Curated annotation (Swiss-Prot):
The gene is cpsD. This is Tyrosine-protein kinase CpsD. The lineage of its organism: Bacteria, Bacillati, Bacillota, Bacilli, Lactobacillales. Its EC number is 2.7.10.2. Keywords: ATP-binding, Capsule biogenesis/degradation, Cytoplasm, Exopolysaccharide synthesis, Kinase, Nucleotide-binding, Phosphoprotein, Transferase, Tyrosine-protein kinase. GO terms for cellular component: cytoplasm; plasma membrane. Belongs to the CpsD/CapB family. The keyword rRNA processing does not apply. Its main location: cytoplasm. Pfam families: AAA_31 (PF13614). It is found in: Cytoplasm. Autophosphorylated. One of its GO terms (molecular function) is non-membrane spanning protein tyrosine kinase activity.
Length: 227
């Protein structure tokens, strides 16, 4: 099994926010015993959804849960900036298109209990791949082997991929950069996730001024939408 190493600069940043993401994972667990597969999306690129996905997965893994992080943003992946490999690795698109076995793309990491499936090469029709039977079968198979599966998706405000993926998950999380996104756009994204029929866990307010007490440390489950 190939091994990925988390970039040292990224790891240093992650450690600074470790306490906050541990609390976020606790909130996820308190939301339901059967929430194993969780999608993470945002309205726009650059809001921190990938950072949030990596941190959630790492927190679960460090707590002793066998955790899989899937890079489902097959259009514009940035997760390769977090994990480094010394060898060529196939990914999600290769498996979904039938050109590679999933076992070839399942990677161990230098973090105990954390495994990763990278996005793979860019597909000419990523939506069709995500709608395929292969994707559904993959998620159902992986459920048997992992305690938690975190799926980083493309921004739901840009493409429909996040909604398609969420339909195969148990719940979803929306990440938004505080002060950078119109409230109406965030509410629309929230509605899209709710329309999948899967539990919407809440909004993570990223880039938040932690001095604003009512949002808590990271804004999850805050007062959003009540003003």
């Amino acid at each position: 099994m190939p091994t990925l190493e988390i970039a040292q600069k990224k790891l240093e940043f992650i450690k600074k926010a470790e306490e906050y993401y541990n609390a976020l994972c606790t909130n996820i667990q308190l939301s339901g015993d059967k929430l194993k597969v969780i999608s993470v999306t945002s309205v726009n690129p650059g809001e921190g959804k990938t950072t949030t996905s990596v941190n959630i997965a790492r927190s679960f893994a460090r707590a002793g849960y066998k955790t899989l992080l899937i890079d489902g943003d097959t259009r514009n992946s940035v997760m390769s900036g977090f994990f480094k490999s010394r060898e060529k690795i196939t990914g999600l698109t290769e498996f979904l298109s039938g050109t590679a076995d999933l076992s070839h793309g399942l990677c161990d990491t230098n973090i105990e209990n954390l495994f990763v499936v990278q996005s793979g090469t860019v597909s000419p029709n990523p939506t069709a791949l995500l709608q395929s039977k292969n994707f559904n079968d993959m998620i159902e198979t992986l459920r048997k082997y992992f305690d938690y599966i975190i799926v980083d998706t493309a921004p739901i405000g840009i493409v429909i991929d996040a909604a398609i993926i969420t339909q195969k998950c148990d719940a979803s999380i929306l990440v938004t950069a505080t002060g950078e996104v119109n409230k109406r756009d965030v509410q629309k994204a929230k509605q899209q996730l709710e329309q999948t029929g899967k539990l919407f866990l809440g909004v993570v307010f990223n880039k938040l001024d932690i001095s604003v007490d009512k949002y808590g440390v990271y804004g999850f489950y805050g007062n959003y939408g009540k003003k």
